[in-house]
Amino acid sequence: MAATAAGVFRRTPEERADQRLAWNRADQPFFAAGACHILAWVCRDTYPDRPIGLAGLRFAGERQVFHVYATWADRAFDHAGWNPEAELLAANREFERRSLDRIAIVDDMATFCQAQHHRMPHEYFGDPLSRARDYVNRHPLPWR
């Protein structure tokens, strides 16, 4: 699947206000907007023998991260599966029509979620960890 901007799947005001409605979205929109950080952490944790990192995107000069993804070599994993990171960055930059900053994420999930006002897994309507594990396992690996 081609790299696609996370903003294409941005939640509606209704989905932001209703966790059940947000939970019931298809997997790609769910992991593009609202649970991208869960997917990234699960991807990294699924392959502990690989040097998988975490990265985030934010609008240039701003503090708030709006999209999180896993990285390995020159590849990125998010709602669109594994793609060249350069393509993921270009798709998001083009969609947002703004400059973006890419940052490395080194905090644990709890620290990141608190600092960035993201939900922890237990704050979702259902279990996003098992849903993310299933989603990660559907995508071919770039190192094979």
Regions found by a protein language model. Name each.
Residues 1-144:
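A structural boundary/capping signal
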